[in-house]
């Protein structure tokens, strides 16, 4: 069940997708005198766009006229592996800390894992390629929202890569209240399963 994360991406029309199935089920019932019960699990379709990752801009690097402007953030494949794995696209928005008008600037976004593949702006369907995005001009410390993160993000991330702790998660309720659903890991929790053999102590 394709769900469009980016502007212009088409999502599956569930009504259209179901029409051929309905007619086949009706035909089966007429021919065999019994009705079939079908259950589907379109989980991603329902929750992908219900979640967002909030990161912060940690550094801004300009590699010159023939290079790129990079935004380095305090997140990456430890929370959203999809871009690095298969060139998946996620909507990204820089949120200025100050209420001011800023220009639009072309950026590549790099994660914090010290991996050449930890990039949140690959070419579509090509994790080996790079594709810049026009975003609001960023400053160090600005928050960044990475949308479409409600499915196949935390659940398939490179957890604890480079000993980064698992991020906290919250739910934003209908009334605007925020509720913690998972605490951020401590370093002790990251290391708790490590054992040092006796002969090395």
Range-by-range predicted roles:
Residues 20-22, 26-201:
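Charged (often Lys/Glu-rich) extended helix/loop segments that serve as interaction or gating elements
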Residues 8-24:
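Well-ordered, non-membrane alpha-helical segments in soluble/globular domains
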Residues 1-13, 42-46:
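Active-site-proximal beta-alpha loop/turn segments in soluble metabolic enzymes
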